[in-house]
Amino acid sequence: LAWNTDIDLLWLGKGARPQSIGLDFSRNISSELEIHGEWAHQYAAGKNTLESSGSTVLSTANPDSYLLGARYLTEHEVTWIVEYLHNGRGYSTSELDSYYAFINSAVNAGETTAQLQKARKLMQSGYNKANSGENYFYLRASVNEPFDWLYTTPALTVISHLDDGSFQFTPEISYTGFSNTELRARAILLSREQRTEFGEKLSRQRFRINTHNFYFIS
């Protein structure tokens, strides 16, 4: 704790992941407003990139990633969270566009087995990970027990890839009226633009109902 701010310093030794250093902080500006952030620096981080010729190149760099955000609680019990994320290891829009074009070509009828295998390897090498781009915006609003709905919390979440304009929109509702159990229903709706991160997902919309059980040992 320094200057009324919670600060953590982090270090990760080299292993399955590159050696990294970082820090995070959180500070309450008032009883309603909190700001937070994270920063990470990686050493000799590998990155597979698809060239325009169709070949794959492995490069190393020392990328920086960071997050800045704020949380605000209104007098009506609405919690707003807004965040900006920069992924230093992410792919540019031109790199992602080349990848999407290759994948779309590889899955067309008549493509060779070698091309399909290469497409699968690319998907596993980093292109298909969550937040594979460079810049993102996150917004979430949740309301605690609106209209006197006891144990109920509805929420809306938007995640946008700022560089290609695609987004994910997630309305959800949770209920905790049962002992040690939470029920959560969620819809995941994606933008439809082709050759964008969220537009290229396998499913354009998904609906899920989850049950979480909690057990406390005294």
Predicted regions and their residues:
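Outer-membrane beta-barrel translocator domains and adjoining extracellular loop/strand segments
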Residues: 19-24, 47-54, 92-99, 156, ...
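Residue-level signature of outer-membrane beta-barrel architecture
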Residues: 1-3, 27, 72-74, 143-145, ...
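Outer-membrane beta-barrel architecture
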Residues: 24-26, 38, 69-71, 140-142, ...
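Transmembrane beta-strands of outer-membrane beta-barrel pores
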Residues: 11-15, 41-45, 84-90, 143-147, ...
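Solvent-exposed loop/turn segments connecting transmembrane beta-strands
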Residues: 11-21, 131-135, 158-170
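Extracellular loop and loop/strand-boundary signature of outer-membrane beta-barrel proteins
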Residues: 11, 51-57, 123-128, 157-159, ...
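Repeated loop/turn-to-beta-strand initiation elements of outer-membrane beta-barrel proteins
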Residues: 2-9, 32-36, 77-80, 147-154, ...
